[in-house]
Amino acid sequence: MAEADFKMVSEPVAHGVAEEEMASSTSDSGEESDSSSSSSSTSDSSSSSSTSGSSSGSGSSSSSSGSTSSRSRLYRKKRVPEPSRRARRAPLGTNFVDRLPQAVRNRVQALRNIQDECDKVDTLFLKAIHDLERKYAELNKPLYDRRFQIINAEYEPTEEECEWNSEDEEFSSDEEVQDNTPSEMPPLEGEEEENPKENPEVKAEEKEVPKEIPEVKDEEKEVPKEIPEVKAEEKADSKDCMEATPEVKEDPKEVPQVKADDKEQPKATEAKARAAVRETHKRVPEERLQDSVDLKRARKGKPKREDPKGIPDYWLIVLKNVDKLGPMIQKYDEPILKFLSDVSLKFSKPGQPVSYTFEFHFLPNPYFRNEVLVKTYIIKAKPDHNDPFFSWGWEIEDCKGCKIDWRRGKDVTVTTTQSRTTATGEIEIQPRVVPNASFFNFFSPPEIPMIGKLEPREDAILDEDFEIGQILHDNVILKSIYYYTGEVNGTYYQFGKHYGNKKYRK
């Protein structure tokens, strides 16, 4: 009996010690304690069932099933909601680092500090690039000013400026080669020695040609010798005819007169032909003068067609050929964009936040009062620990537009519709303003909120806006002529494509 009592006392103590060890070894206190308490309850039930004997077997099975159901209920009640578990979950990298030995973790932290210093160097690199862009933009400014003057008919380029002056490219079109080639091509390097030997033969052949000309003259001289023989035969035939027809007699005095008449007839015809030619020459200028006078009289009421000044619609065509901007330009935007005289790019000054600004200069127009429309892009220039690869290049952080001072009834960014309300039973017409698709929405981008997130539609608009700003910055301002001529073909990235004057390219 004493031994049985000792066993009954020692078993619960052992189970209690085991429970304490399991609780201390586990990391999740709530779930592990629940499991330990459930295991203790099962152990107590098993110990009580062992003392009760085999007669209480069915009762023990029912108690075990009841304990499992109660355990599941406790687990469900104490389970942490999924969103909060996600919030508490640490990144995979930290979990991996936490499992490393302490000495290795210290070294990893030292590498993190080195990476922070590298990010600071990258920020200096980006600022240096910005300073270089500002420097070379000042060098390009005189060229951009000349481009502005030619487009807006303030300066007429000279003939030398209109010629293709590229040193890398040569004339290659067939027409230009035929026009510019001399009558005698210069000898090649291998043919310089052979040509002098061939030249005497050519000269000899050229000398032989005049010798043949006298032979031709001799043949021409021989022809008149045959003519008297023909005349003699004709005289003989005429004598035979005279003998055969003795009735017909001609006076010898009349024959010379007939010959004289035959000689005078060709002279008279030649004189008449010459007189007719002279009369035609005299009449042609008179007819031309009359035609020119009639044309002048007809053109008095019509204005003369003058050559266009400058390059009309230059920037309208350029923007329409830009990949992202072309679809934004509507038909009702084009008359406004015809007043666009220049698009310039300006960089922020030293000491200010890194940014660049596009200035759209407009001539006085009947649509809005602004002379310049501005769009500014702010660049991320500080390291961001949430984005470790920010230093791969420029990244636009935010953009700001400007307010357009539209004239009355000329705002193309909105449309006014009339909605009918029948709340009082009467039909009332109330105007309602609805946003409209337009290029000029480019100057009113969605604002990024300080707290919260943008809607998906606004977020997509902002992403596309950032792409447009990058294209304008990289390509359009510097190489607008290729967009005007259509050589870009509306594409942004075209590796291996050559630009320039197609007419004179090899």
Swiss-Prot record:
UniProt-recorded Gene Ontology molecular function terms: chromatin binding; histone binding
Stretch list, region Disordered: 1-95, 157-307
Biological processes annotated in GO: nucleosome assembly
Cellular component, GO, one term: chromatin
Cellular compartment(s): Nucleus
Keywords associated with the record: Nucleus
UniProt biased composition (Acidic residues): 157-178
Name of the protein in its database record: Nucleosome assembly protein 1-like 3
Organism: Homo sapiens (Human)
Gene that this polypeptide is encoded by: NAP1L3
